[in-house]
Amino acid sequence: MRAYAEWEEQELLFLSLPHSNSDWEPYLEEILAGYEELVAAIVPFEKVVLICPDEANFARFKKFKNVEFVKLDTDDTWIRDYGMIDVCTKDGVKSYDFKFNAWGGKFKSSKDDAINLELAKIYKTKLEPVDMILEGGSVEFNGDGVLLTTTKCLLNENRNKALSKEQIEEKLKNLFGLKRIIWLENGFIKGDDTDSHIDTLARFIKPDTIAYASCEDESDEHFDELKRMEDELKKTGFKLLALPLPKPKFYDGKRLGCTYTNFIFINGALIVPTYNDENDEKVLNLLAQALPDRKIIGVNSLVFVRQNGSLHCSSQNRYKRS
């Protein structure tokens, strides 16, 4: 049993489209245009499956090759957190269906929590239900037995209140074949409502390297926490790559949760959120230097973050079946 590193070979990428019966309704056209840009970046490399209850929203994507459409009802778009999670076993790929309660009961979630059963039928998936709340954005694997995660999310009483830290660790080790769990106690992104998901803060980009959100502006509200997180990461023994936060961005008076670590690995490429910021190009260049065998593609994510998520949150990878 082994958890995949996200850069391993994939079969397709799931995306769950915004629709009018969701929080995206006030700026639906803007966010669908954002998804159009995202799909355009992915399809030269990998198949995309678009999920939506409203078939009218599929129309703009019909021009793309390498896209499949699935009509299913959803509460929200953030399929990273309610989508099935693949693991590698001696008998091939297996997928876990964890319970989903919308980040500790913050929003409605019954449709999202039910979607894996339907997708498993369509994509003939060996699906194993797991009696535990876990979101894909809260766990980060290096493919070699190491999990990176945060105490603020996984140990939050709004997830698995009945389980102790030791019980959660035991479950995770058994489910994902882990040798080591790295718990980060510091780190947050303003505008994130997941209780500090790891995919907003620190990500493996190689088995031995972690890219992380950094802040050099002492006047920024992130400075102290991200410095403490950086100190924690320096003690892990992994190589580190600092990705500086963009300058503060606001919408409707609210600071947006802009972070460059919310990137997506696909076959042959890395899709990176950008924010019309001077650091966009700097971060894309840093990642290109670190991953010379991959095409690094920026996709504007300023509309995505209005609803507190970005590109990685919006997607879920399905790994190659033999």
Language model segments and positions:
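The feature marks the mature, well-folded catalytic cores of soluble enzymes
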Residues: 1-322
